[in-house]
Design a protein with these regions (language model features):
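Structural signal for hydrophobic packing residues in well-ordered secondary-structure cores
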Residues: 16-23, 30, 45-53, 73, ...
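A structured beta-alpha segment of the ubiquitous adenosine-cofactor-binding alpha/beta core
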Residues: 57-76
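Active-site glycine- and acidic-residue-rich loops that bind
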Residues: 39, 67, 90
Length: 210
């Protein structure tokens, strides 16, 4: 696992800028007490942090961070870390949300960006209409934010939040009263468009009106 300085600087700047649009808190997660590459990350990020005095900057070792994200997830705003640790923490965070099917992701390059669900493809669910589409939909919202289409992105976030509040979910989150992938997509689309929706009963004895 090796990095060039410019690579760490680029992602560090992106993380600090993201923090400035949130709670202005950033935590660097590494293993600087053991790994040379983590010491390199910490040295580089410490210098970048000087350019963002308005952001509250902290550091945690990965083992402590893995514990804290379960015990007190709200303490974190933006986490900056290397790919190895990020893969671990993102899967761990899915336990808090209830499903990997809720987690979007983005890979931001200098010229190109990629937005996709954290879980990647789901070949086991092909043709079964059972996948949770929320992660993909939220990935689209992140893409809109990248294009500075903030209102459009917020409309998506609001629609998804509404579904979660009303327990309109796929089977991975609500096995007793669940909606299919296509139903979820249609509902979220209608909410974004501001349409009045009546949800048909998906299972006997269940019905919802938004």
């Amino acid at each position: 696992m090796s990095y060039e300085r410019y690579e760490v600087e680029r992602i560090a700047h992106a993380a600090f800028k993201s923090a400035m649009n949130r709670r202005s808190e950033l935590c660097l997660v590494d293993k600087a007490n053991v790994l040379e590459v983590s010491r390199f990350w910490r040295e580089t990020v410490n210098k970048v942090a000087e350019e963002y005095p308005s952001v509250e900057y902290s550091q945690l070792y990965i083992d402590n961070a893995a514990m804290q994200i379960i015990l007190n997830p709200s303490r974190f705003d933006v986490i900056l870390t290397a790919n190895l640790f990020g893969d671990i923490l993102s899967d761990e965070a899915s336990v808090i949300s209830g499903s990997l099917g809720l987690l979007p992701s983005s890979s931001i390059g200098e010229k190109h960006c990629l937005f996709e669900p954290v879980h990647g493809s789901y070949p086991e669910g092909a043709g079964k209409d059972i996948a949770n589409p929320v992660a993909m939909i939220l990935s689209a919202a992140m893409m809109l934010e990248q294009f500075d289409m903030i209102k459009e992105a917020q409309d998506i976030y609001d629609a998804v939040d509404h579904c979660m509040e009303k327990s309109i979910m796929t089977e991975d989150l609500n096995p007793e009263v669940s909606y299919s992938c296509s139903q979820m997509g249609d509902i979220i689309e209608s909410l974004i468009l501001g349409e009045d929706i009546k949800l048909k009963s998906v299972k006997e004895g269940s019905a919802s009106i938004i």
